[in-house]
Regions:
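Bacterial N-terminal signal peptides that target proteins for export
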Residues: 2-19
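A generic signature of intrinsically disordered, low-complexity regions enriched in glycine/proline
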Residues: 7-10, 40, 74, 154
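Intrinsically disordered, low-complexity repeat/linker tracts enriched for polar/charged residues
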Residues: 11, 38-50, 54, 60
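C-terminal motif of bacterial Sec signal peptides marking the signal peptidase cleavage site
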Residues: 28-31
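Bacterial signal peptide processing site
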Residues: 33-36
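Conserved functional acidic sites
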Residues: 49, 53-317
Length: 317
């Protein structure tokens, strides 16, 4: 998720996803109904929704192609406590839903884990997240995604290393990392998302056609997913130059993170996801995750020689 285009990293697969379990456990559930069904007051269904005049957007309406990045504005970059996108090491999100591939709607599952690894990218120490994407039970993508929070509370996306698979066979590793091949950092989530504000870049990786942007779609929404029911939900719409007219909707609960994914417009994947499990991993489980993430990084140094191999190694606690 993700973010990956969290949650989806290929032009045809945008995920995300987007997280703070310790805080989440202290948040009381809203007064919604059952957990397995959408709240009756929910105004944005998980399937297609209509664009409203308040939130109509397009790549042409943006004010700037990428964001101004100041690497000196990251004094505590690995402490990511953004209200809408907190990232605490050991937090694991599991999403389930479906997406359309080859004209068929297939089960889709995403496992997004915040590791306890950090990695310096473009002069900023980032938090390493490990993201796995399954279609019809088969792994189609595994990815390392790199995030950091600036002193103003914005969460930045500084790159990612994805490995793509088809029928169990490795296909490609279209990595983009800020500072290489003209790639630039983008903002995954602003500290204070504002309705009506111009869209912003979530990262710029021209070598692999990464041009994702985000904009506030709606605020103050309610939604129910298997994990819980949430109020005051922020809904963001994401789009890219490669998919004009296709929008992914991501639902963010305060203090939690991404809890739902939907779509609108001409999105060929029509991806829908709901948060079905949220856990804080044990020390042993987190160590296992760290080991697997480091295995993925080791492959990255071999498969992405011009990009990832030029970075310094990830570091553990």
């Amino acid at each position: 998720m993700w973010n990956s285009r969290h949650p989806r990293s290929r032009p045809s697969r945008r995920r995300g996803p987007f997280v703070l379990a310790a805080l989440l456990l202290a948040i009381p559930p809203s007064a919604c109904g059952g957990r397995d069904q959408q709240s009756q007051s929910q105004t944005l269904p998980e399937t297609q929704v209509e664009t409203t005049p308040q939130t109509t957007s397009s790549p042409e309406a943006t004010e700037q192609r990428w964001e101004v990045f100041d690497r000196n504005n990251f004094d505590q970059s690995t402490t990511i406590e953004n209200e809408w996108f907190p990232l605490q090491p050991g937090t694991q999100f599991i999403y389930e839903g479906s997406s359309v591939e080859g004209g068929k709607r297939l089960p889709h599952r995403v496992v997004f884990t915040v590791t306890d690894l950090t990695k310096v990218i473009d002069g900023v120490r980032t938090v390493v997240a490990w993201d796995r994407d399954y279609s019809a039970g088969e792994l189609v993508e595994t990815e390392l995604a790199l995030f950091a929070q600036d002193d103003d509370g914005n969460v930045w996306h500084l790159g990612q290393y994805p490995e793509e698979y088809e029928k169990g066979e490795f296909v490609d590793a279209p990595a983009w990392i800020a500072g290489f091949q003209n790639a630039r950092p983008g903002i995954s989530m602003k500290a204070k998302p504002e309705p009506g504000a111009p869209s912003y870049s979530q990262g710029w990786g021209p070598a692999v056609n990464w041009t994702d942007r985000a904009q506030v779609y709606r605020t103050g929404e309610e939604t129910c997913v298997p994990v819980d029911c949430y109020e005051d939900v922020l809904v963001m719409e994401e789009f890219s130059e490669e998919e004009p007219g296709a929008f992914q909707l991501k639902y963010y609960a305060p203090g939690v993170g991404n809890v739902r994914v939907g779509w609108k417009g001409d999105d060929p994947s029509r991806e829908t996801l709901k948060l079905v499990k949220l856990v804080q991993l044990s020390a042993e489980a987190l160590a296992d995750v760290r080991a697997e993430a480091l295995k993925l990084e080791k492959r990255a140094y071999t498969l992405s020689k011009d990009v990832y191999a030029q970075t310094s190694p990830a570091e553990g606690p």
